[in-house]
Amino acid sequence: RFHQSNREYELIDWIHEAGRLRAQGQLAGLVLNAGAYTHTSVALADAVKGTGVTLIELHISNVHAREPFRHHSYLSAVARAVMCGFGVAGYGLAIDALAQMQ
């Protein structure tokens, strides 16, 4: 299943849905590119932590080679893994990695 939204509340709702699916054994985990919310959203991190969902935090670019404010992530502390800098190919790599974690 794939979702895209620029609305933080929708991302939180989908994380909560993922938690329900995980509890039912229907979900391996999430690959999340939260964009700028990575650096600002305690709410997204709390949602992941509260659901216990396995998370791979994904960034298309190498955020550590960008502006200093992008070097901090609220999600990294609740993510099983962090991937960055692979371009859009990172999505496939992250899904493969998620499958290997199970």
Language-model features: where?
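Short, well-structured alpha-helical segments in soluble
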Residues: 13-25
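Short, hinge-like loop/turn segments at secondary-structure boundaries
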Residues: 18-20, 49-50, 72-77
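A charged, well-structured terminal subsegment
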Residues: 84-102
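Hydrophobic/aromatic beta-strand patches that form the interior of the parallel beta-sheet core
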Residues: 3, 31, 56, 81-83
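Short beta->alpha junction loops
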Residues: 1-9
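Short beta-strand elements at the ligand-binding edges of bilobed clamshell
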Residues: 70-88
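Mid-chain, well-packed structural core segment of small domains
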Residues: 25-66
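Short acidic active-site motifs
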Residues: 10-14, 40
